[in-house]
Amino acid sequence: MDNTLKHLAIIMDGNGRWAKLKNKARAYGHKKGVKTLKDITIWCANHKLECLTLYAFSTENWKRPKSEVDFLMKMLKKYLKDERSTYLNNNIRFKAIGDLEGFSKELRDTILQLENDTRHFKDFTQVLALNYGSKNEISRAFKSLLESPPSNISLLESLENEISNRLDTRNLPEVDLLLRTGGEMRLSNFLLWQSSYAELFFTPILWPDFTPKDLENIISDFYKRVRKFGELKC
């Protein structure tokens, strides 16, 4: 199997703790985190990756204080509108995954507009996971399978393909490297199906402090690893 890094997935963790260390409100950390998101996205677009998926808002994040959730929704809408030129100027295709029905119509329309405006770009895709949870995604895929089953599924491999083709990430490569910033060592219900053979990397660097140079170092480590995909390799 190909060892090339095509799909990088990132759990962007540490905005709130970063702000607290600076005696600032959590919103300050989220704003700085958006700048990091932009910097990392442009770096990936310029370094021949095919796909970057960023965990922006989980299905569990609705449990946060309403004031913080409201701020995040406003910030997301502003980002998608303000950075339209960034996507167009850097040939970045934008895609959102997750249960978008959980958002307001205005925000959904903003998401769909940027997807439509960038759909013609082919070389690099930035994916934002929004109102996303892997269990929710897999459940929706099974629901779709039950509601419109194929004529015959005789082999387990066929069943796996049917599920994969009903996930939000269909037509995207499987995850090669899953990175989490902020020091926590858990996957937090993120791309569990797609990361079955991904290399995992956990860094203590808080997301607002994370730089393209840090990413370069992690990718260098990725290429030193031997990816076996279940095989025996000498």
Model-derived segments and their meaning:
Residues M1-C234:
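Flexible, compositionally biased loop and terminal segments
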